[in-house]
Amino acid sequence: LLIIVLALTVFALFANRAIKKANPEEVPGPFLNVIELIVELIDGLTKSNMGKRGVRFSNYIGTLFTMVLVCNISGLFGLRPPTADYGVTLPLALITFVLIHYNGFKYEKAGHVTKLFQPVLLTPINIIGEIATPLSMSLRLFGNVLSGTVMMGLIYGLVPKLIQAFLWPVFGVLHVYFDVFSGAIQAYVFCMLTMVFIAQNFPEDEAQDRKSVV
């Protein structure tokens, strides 16, 4: 995890330096074009799922997606994916959990708490439902990434090392599926759930705005 954090930090510093040095009157280079495309995609995705008020969460969503995606595909570089450790996925889900209730208190005030007791008979279920949100998000990401890591470990363990060199195309395809394809999907799902859960506490007029954007 430390290696990935350091790599992302260096990349962020390099990107920030390139953006500051860029001349607005000149045509941006390939690197800046890619950065601009990524930022526009994240802003568009955030706005379409969270509405205008959700745009301020774009930085968090972009950082979260990048972090989870890089962690998921780190197996391609011979590293054990940090997201295969529940000690990583749970804090990520807890950050989302805090943002959900921060947003709830901001827009609903005391009503964010009182709605847990409506109706009174369903209060235990409502509380369990709130607690289940970070647990389900963290366990989903942890389980999917861990299963891919275990599968690749079993495959490498079953195939003799002398034969592995001749089966690199097969291992390449498996890594593309378990690391890249599955990793990208899990990062996308985690961020989508984050946006949906945070946005559900926005006022009703914001929900209408999201529908109009879609």
PLM regions with names:
Residues 1-214:
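Selective transmembrane helix interface/packing segments
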